[in-house]
Amino acid sequence: MSKPIVAVVGRPNVGKSTLFNKLCGQRLAIVEDTPGITRDRIFANCEWSGHEFLLVDTGGIEPKATEGILAHMREQAQIAIDTADCIIMVVDVRNGLTAADEDVAHMLRRSHKPIILAVNKCDNVGETPMELYEFYNLGFDEVMPISSVHGHGTGDLLDAVCAHLDFSETVVEEDRIPVAIIGRPNVGKSSLTNRILGENRMIVANEAGTTRDAIDTPVDNAYGKFIFTDTAGLRKRSNITDGLERYMVVRALAAVERSRVALILVDATVGFTEQDSKVAGYAHDQGKACIIVVNKWDAVEGKETNTMELQRRGYAECFSFMGYAPIIFISAQTGYNVNKLLQLIRDVDSQNGARVPTGVLNEMLARATARMQPPSDKGRRLKIFYLTQASTRPPTFVAFVNAKHLFHFSYQRYIINQIRENFGLEHTPIRLVVRERGSGEVGAKEDRKST
């Protein structure tokens, strides 16, 4: 299912980021921050009262010197309107109601989405400042005094947010492979979906997906049953601004959440961009099976016999953090390699859901440690007592060892590579959890590596 999206909106210096950090750091159990995409902490997968949602802080958008504050606020509001299921508008009780507040509130009202007004910096517990009441002039039904610094009122705020969200699960047939098609604007996401539909006539139906404006398209063909989620509803505006890129990322995150396989589309005529890495990084950290799909190969001019291999090496370097992801060159326009892509989707999905019996796993471990002796330090050598698989999607293995600090990064990578080679898991992320054991007891120390 797709997690609901909650956006935090407000003019600079009203405490948006402080509120975001307070919710994520203390009031909410963070499921996982989004590495790569969120170096400035704009996204967090969060949980409150047993419900999960994606929290988005639009505060990272800063106006350029030539932009006015109202233009900045309009951009923030538009992002919230386009992506969120519920909006928290933050204002500053100390500064009172401003023209910028009124301007963005007017835009938000037109969205017809649930809006909660969080009046920040009400720091005295049990006291309602008189200045609070002027914010009722904005016309919102829910006006809540909070203190993002001290956490006052944030629990009530989250209760109000969750009351507006739909947490019902979208049921997907278990035998269908949910596939997210993600990428920058104009890389050919919609064209790829249309090509798949055009070549494979056994279409079940088109359904409006729960992902924001995305379309779920179930497809049956000789390669299996799929449900493709195309985020092609996002179209490039006059300029790719920082705000628009954030908008694109939020849309992509929602599609990735409900997928098992993520197709990261890249435009062969443009090449790699930082935004490609950001979107791919989120899919990687969610443990999805990923495929780097280089589209528009037919439009690349001056190709020679080694052009594809040279470009493959270049993309492999750009996406080095997910070296397991296969790279395939296609043309959605001509159909080149599209059927091969469908088979590849099945292969990576199968690997992502694979299970390895504990006995077979430890036979492999014995061979691996005999081939390359575990590292030692100051006369003490690492001993891996045994390996077991804890879960799938992605395959997650637990290693019980005598001393966690002896299990060096390089040797962890060696063991993971042995798992890949021995069990045909070359094209899925693998997580290795290290638990320290002493005197027959499982220690409290734990470490995790994902690759």
Predicted regions and their residues:
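C-terminal-of-GTPase-core extension/linker across diverse P-loop GTPases
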Residues: 1-25, 30, 97-102, 109-112, ...
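Switch I (G2) and immediately adjacent beta-strands of P-loop GTPase domains
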Residues: 33-68, 74-86, 209-239, 257-261
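Hydrophobic alpha-helical bundles that form the membrane domains of multi-pass transporters
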Residues: 56, 60-81, 86-101, 105-109, ...
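Hydrophobic beta-strand scaffold residues
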Residues: 87-88, 115, 290
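Accessory, often N-terminal, substrate/partner-engagement and coupling regions
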Residues: 92, 117-123
